[in-house]
Amino acid sequence: MATINYKIIKDFFSKEELNVLQKYCYNRIDFNKDYQVDPQSFSPAWYNDPLMIALLDTKLPVVEKNSNLKLFPTYAYWRYYVFGAYLKQHTDRSSCEISVTVCIKKYDNWPLIIEKQIIELKEGEALLYEGYDQKHGRPGIYKGNGMAQLFLHYVNQNGPYKKHAYDQISKNK
């Protein structure tokens, strides 16, 4: 994948799948306060949420096709960016060798920056990138009304980080 740099996957979710996912996320926000505050963005985050773990496996063939790699899932979570969120440029840990971030719902634009490239995802679109190697983040402080983002992480089955397969899933069930 090192030669791909990053790739936008259009229609990662069908309209029906996206609708279900949006409703699910907003129900979690409204009725379940079991989130963690993400230390990077200061926003609510749900790590290894059961639906997101199901998506980690369900979307594996799509991610493998687009990365041209055989992958092991590592973990998944989703975050709801709130007014005042901040996400500085960073790289992720080795369990995020291959990462996918999906725009679930947004009311305002707050682009991704990956290796100095500005990327705007539409709802349902995904960005495939090397989270462990590529610096990524978002510019400035979020001044919008909310944005839900899904993160699916994988490692190359033949790579140096394969020991991280399913690394946090069993710990957080």
Regions found by a protein language model. Give the residues of each.
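Active-site donor-binding loop signature of nucleotide-sugar glycosyltransferases
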Residues: D11, G140, Y154
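Catalytic core of non-heme Fe(II) oxygenases with the double-stranded beta-helix
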Residues: F83-R138, N145-L150, N156-S170
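Secondary-structure boundary/capping signal
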Residues: E17, K70-L71, D108
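Conserved active-site beta-strand element of glycosyltransferases/polysaccharide synthases
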Residues: Y80
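Generic beta-strand or strand-like secondary-structure segments
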Residues: T58-V62, Y77, S99
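Non-heme Fe(II)/2-oxoglutarate
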Residues: M1-S67
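A structural signal for short, well-ordered beta-strand segments and their strand-loop junctions
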Residues: I8-I9, F72-P73, L128-Y129, F151
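A short coil-to-beta-strand element that immediately follows conserved catalytic motifs
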Residues: N68-Y77
